[in-house]
Amino acid sequence: MYYKFIREEKIKMKRKEYTAVNFSNADFSKPLCGFTFTDCNFVNANMREAEIHGCEFIDCDMRGADLSLSIIKNTVFTSDVEYSLDLLGANIEYADIIDSKFRRCNMAGVNLRASRIYNTELYSVRLKDAKLTSARFVNSILEDSHYSGERDFVLVHTEWRD
């Protein structure tokens, strides 16, 4: 698979595991399937409309990354790094989001159907028209996060503070 960088460079992703690799400003236009990224830099990466399946993002810096309108399935985000990204309309079904912090993220129209969100903090997150059917928020905090939609999700030991 090739990924085009802003500087018109191309790299071929030959491995399935990457540690401490700088993908800042990268343009991910091809599907990502079965990759593990640990301590990688995705600052301002363009993942708009990306297809991400069966991947793990462990302690990656994703500030400013654009995942809007992406399809993200069976993917794990584990981090104590603060995310500030655009997830507008992203499809994040069946994902595991663990030990993460989302601040000032645009998650309007995001589809988190059947996703599991554990030990995660969402601050000032815009969840307008988000689809949370069967999503499970466990030991999480949602603060100043605005949601409009049906309450057909599960909150377990989770605080929702407006």
Q: Where in this protein do the model-derived segments appear?
A:
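Tandem repeat scaffolds
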Residues: 2-162
